[in-house]
């Protein structure tokens, strides 16, 4: 599976007047923004993180959204999707009404992703497109938030080339959305509030969940791994874990509300709890507590092999509502490339980890992420990635061609692998990925699987669609009233990436055993 397949599941430059001196934008960054710095970021400490449990919207903002609508377009990962749920919750507490028609919105937010240059280009293109709506409705507020906002080069570009944008804010101050909106309504200049501070943990933020079947729950924020290709440690800040009692309470509330599946989110969930100074409590402890809650399925993303410990494996082996699917990004099968990437593990370490997981959970499905064409990658090193994929027997993968991200150490490396070589390697890798995915799904032909029905198929309204515990897509015909329920389906046909089945029955509601 390539990036295009992954994303499928989900510029107007203003002329400058020559007779005026160029505006000095540095003032925007003196207090609220610091450019990404690997050296400075690695020095960041723990003492600045504070926990706030008393979030509420001040009375001064009451009625702000009366007779006004909002629209949020989200780019990128599940973390961004969850941030959108929070912002939608804040909007609705302010009295705004959501709309799906962007040109009719009174406030438009682009919640951005900085992981790849292609994602950023889409945002700039959308900003140019929004200008025509702004001209028709000068009262429309346009805002840019999310990871791109944490990059100084991006904010500078918006300030210079997209003056119709009204507000820019970062990932650390979503809770200040009411203040930012108020200032945008009152100000004649673009409101820029991007904190270089690494962020606190804000509890009790309102949320407008995007669905009623599956829910995302943040367990931590940020990342301290500093892989040389990745911008996330700069845009999301240092690792900071939510307190376990807050997470457990949220999951209990979701279970009581009828949710069937919880996805625990973090840039590196396996580092959960490492920053606690008063308790010894890691991801394995959290999963052990959550498995006792009466909710059918719990899964997590994203894992880092370096922090995947034996206790977590031991807990996952207890199964119950802990699913048998682990997404474990390896990125490369070459020790030399892993070292350049600063992944801090070796091929041998990764294979030993996989061996432990498979020994404890024989039915486990493993999926991964892989980058090809990294600086200095040789044909032999790429072949090592192919051999590792076969040795592990991954059942699916998100595959990418390397592209440099400004502000990362890798961007300073010579990108010396020709583009045609990168594309050829990606094609060869995807052939292997497709082969192993097809074989894995073919083994299910004739088997009965448990499916959480999420709705109708994207292609046919008379076909239902859902996912197995191992996150495999299943399409089948059945009664619409089973949407939102767990059902048993017999597999009758397979493709490289999905299954077709025959509806059998609804799964009986069984209490989760402790």
Curated annotation (Swiss-Prot):
SMART domains reported in the protein's UniProt record: Elp3 (SM00729)
InterPro entries (alphabetical): Elp3/MiaA/NifB-like_rSAM, Methylthiotransferase, Methylthiotransferase_CS, Methylthiotransferase_N, Methylthiotransferase_N_sf, MiaB_methiolase, rSAM, rSAM_horseshoe
Binding annotation for [4Fe-4S] cluster 1: 77, 113, 147
Location of the Radical SAM core domain: 209-439
Highest taxon listed in the record's lineage: Bacteria
Bilayer-spanning residue ranges: none
EC number: 2.8.4.3
Chain positions recorded as [4Fe-4S] cluster 2 binding sites: 223, 227, 230
An example Gene Ontology CC term for this record: cytosol
Domain MTTase N-terminal, first and last residues per copy: 68-186
Renumbered residue ranges of the record's region Disordered: 1-24
UniProt cross-references to PROSITE patterns, sorted A to Z: MTTASE_N, MTTASE_RADICAL, RADICAL_SAM, TRAM
Domain TRAM: from-to ranges: 442-505
Pfam families xrefs: Radical_SAM (PF04055), TRAM (PF01938), UPF0004 (PF00919)
Biased composition (Basic and acidic residues): 15-24
Keywords assigned: 4Fe-4S, Cytoplasm, Iron, Iron-sulfur, Metal-binding, S-adenosyl-L-methionine, Transferase, tRNA processing
Keyword Cytoplasm: yes
GO MF annotation list: 4 iron, 4 sulfur cluster binding; metal ion binding; N6-isopentenyladenosine methylthiotransferase activity
Required cofactor names: [4Fe-4S] cluster
Free-text cofactor note: Binds 2 [4Fe-4S] clusters. One cluster is coordinated with 3 cysteines and an exchangeable S-adenosyl-L-methionine.
HAMAP family: tRNA_metthiotr_MiaB
Subunit (UniProt): Monomer.
Function: Catalyzes the methylthiolation of N6-(dimethylallyl)adenosine (i(6)A), leading to the formation of 2-methylthio-N6-(dimethylallyl)adenosine (ms(2)i(6)A) at position 37 in tRNAs that read codons beginning with uridine.
Family: Belongs to the methylthiotransferase family. MiaB subfamily.
Protein name in UniProt: tRNA-2-methylthio-N(6)-dimethylallyladenosine synthase
Native source organism of the sequence: Lysinibacillus sphaericus (strain C3-41)
């Amino acid at each position: 599976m390539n990036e295009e397949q992954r994303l499928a599941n989900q510029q107007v430059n203003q002329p400058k007047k020559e007779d005026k001196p160029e505006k000095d934008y540095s003032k925007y960054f003196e207090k609220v923004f610091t450019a990404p710095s690997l050296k400075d970021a690695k020095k960041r400490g723990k003492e600045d993180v504070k926990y706030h449990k008393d979030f509420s919207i001040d009375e001064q903002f009451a009625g702000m959204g009366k007779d006004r609508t909002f629209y949020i377009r989200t780019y990128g990962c599940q973390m961004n999707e969850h941030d959108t749920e929070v912002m939608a919750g804040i909007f609705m507490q302010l009295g705004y009404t959501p709309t799906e028609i962007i040109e009719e919105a009174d406030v438009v937010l682009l919640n951005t992703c900085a992981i790849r240059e292609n994602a950023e280009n889409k945002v700039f293109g959308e900003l140019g497109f929004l200008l025509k709506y702004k001209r028709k409705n000068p009262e429309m507020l346009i805002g840019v938030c999310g990871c791109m906002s944490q990059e100084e080069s991006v904010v500078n570009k918006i300030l210079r080339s997209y003056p119709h944008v009204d507000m820019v804010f970062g990932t650390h101050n979503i809770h200040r959305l009411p203040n930012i909106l108020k200032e945008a309504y009152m100000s004649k200049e673009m409101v820029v509030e991007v904190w270089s501070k690494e962020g606190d943990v804000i509890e009790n933020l309102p949320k407008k969940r995007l669905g009623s079947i599956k829910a995302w729950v943040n367990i931590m924020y940020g990342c301290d791994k500093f892989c040389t290709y990745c911008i996330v440690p700069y845009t999301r800040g240092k690792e900071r874990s939510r307190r376990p009692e807050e997470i457990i309470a949220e999951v209990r509330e979701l279970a009581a509300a009828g949710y069937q599946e919880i996805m625990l989110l973090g840039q590196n969930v396996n580092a959960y709890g490492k920053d606690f100074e008063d308790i010894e409590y890691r991801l394995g402890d959290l999963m052990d507590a959550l498995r006792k809650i009466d909710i059918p399925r719990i899964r997590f993303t994203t894992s880092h092999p370096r922090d995947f410990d034996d206790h977590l494996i031991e807990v996952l082996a207890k199964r119950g509502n802990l699913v048998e699917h682990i997404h474990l990004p390896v990125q490369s099968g070459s020790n030399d490339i892993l070292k350049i990437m600063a992944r801090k593990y070796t091929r041998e370490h990764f294979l030993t980890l996989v061996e432990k997981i498979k020994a404890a959970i024989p039915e486990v499905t493993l999926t991964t992420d892989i980058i090809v064409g990294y600086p200095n990658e040789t044909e032999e090193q790429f072949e090592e990635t192919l051999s590792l994929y076969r040795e592990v027997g991954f059942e699916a993968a998100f595959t990418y061609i390397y592209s440099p991200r400004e502000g990362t150490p890798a961007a300073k490396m010579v990108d010396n692998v020709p583009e045609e070589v990168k594309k050829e390697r990606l094609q060869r890798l995807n052939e292997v990925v497709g082969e192993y995915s097809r074989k894995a799904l073919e083994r299910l032909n004739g088997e009965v699987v448990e499916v959480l029905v999420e709705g109708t198929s994207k292609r046919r309204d008379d076909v239902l669609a859902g996912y197995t515990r191992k996150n495999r897509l299943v399409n089948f015909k059945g009664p619409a009233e089973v949407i939102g329920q767990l059902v048993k389906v017999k597999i009758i046909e397979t493709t490289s990436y999905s299954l077709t089945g025959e509806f059998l029955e609804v799964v009986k509601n069984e209490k989760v055993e402790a």
